[in-house]
Amino acid sequence: MSGIPSEDTLLHNSGPSRRFCVAPMMDWTTSHYRYLARQLSRHTLLYTEMVTTGALIHGDTARFLRHDEAEYPLALQLGGSDAGELAHCARLAQQYGFDEVNLNVGCPSDRVQNNMIGACLMGHPDKVAEGVRAMIEATELPVTVKHRIGIDGRESWDDLCEFVEKVSEAGCRTFIVHARIAILEGLSPKENREVPPLKYDWVYRLKAKYPHLEIIINGGIKTFDECHEHLRHTDGVMLGREAYHNPWLLAGVDPEFFGEAAPVETRHQALRAMLPFIGSELERGVFLTHMSRHLLGLFHGQPGGRQFRRYISENAHKSGAGLEVIE
């Protein structure tokens, strides 16, 4: 199997720059966090939390897909395995203005496994290929896949290559690879981010073997020096928890990786830039704590940073708490 997409497919799957991305993270990469991230970097590609196809089709679609245009470029991550449902949701992604639609084939949670969502799908590459093909036919957006390097029982190099080849033959050009296997039984999602060893060299080998594919590396990346090393071997980097707990890191992305000045020069400037958005959300009935929790790491490692965290944590949840807590 060559796995070489046609020229039309390559064009179809280009989309936004993925040189530097922030990973989709449940409960963390909400619209409120993404708005903060965008005050710090104009070019970082942001991802939503995973949304299941069932939630989008049978739930409050508008609520799940709500975002601010200021968040662009923005990708929607879907969880699901039914080709028809994935196609329907890919159309919704385009309708709501997203820049990319991404399929989750990396989450190891028991809850999603039972619904054939996430990392368990690495054991069913034909099903993933079917879903990807349906999504590509349903939308003009680039369709990408985020996955592990394997799962227990299917963790060989040949297994990984079979997965990538089958999914690329379905038309997927971009693979975001978490450089660990997922152990589907016996480990929690948190343990699955820490216990299986990182094998960055496997991701490098994927890019070397399939140079026509766009390979983005993910897993345990924390510093710009590490990013530059990975970019010697891959097309892009994706950071997760480091970009959440230390969001000011993102203020260095545009000058470091895109040759442009950062949108803000100081943390205080970033905080002030958030105030109109927070105010409008408060008027919409959103509780302050739903937004302020994403600000807690903004002064990470700075003098007064702990006091800032403590003050926000102790006051944002109080009844009637408003902008005065942040200001």
Briefly describe each language-model feature range.
Residues 1-16, 20-21, 26, 32, ...:
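Alpha/beta catalytic cores of nucleotide-metabolism and tRNA/nucleoside-modifying enzymes
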Residues 21, 46-47, 75-77, 102-104, ...:
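Conserved beta-strand positions in the central sheet of alpha/beta enzyme cores
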Residues 25-27, 51-53, 79-81, 106-108, ...:
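Active-site beta-loop-alpha junctions enriched in small/polar residues
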Residues 39, 87-117, 125-213:
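Alpha/beta enzyme core
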Residues 57-61, 113-116, 156-157, 187-190, ...:
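Short secondary-structure transition/capping segments
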Residues 63-67, 119-121, 161-163, 192-195, ...:
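Short, hinge-like loop/turn segments at secondary-structure boundaries
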Residues 78, 119-120, 195, 262, ...:
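Pocket-edge positions in alpha/beta enzyme catalytic cores
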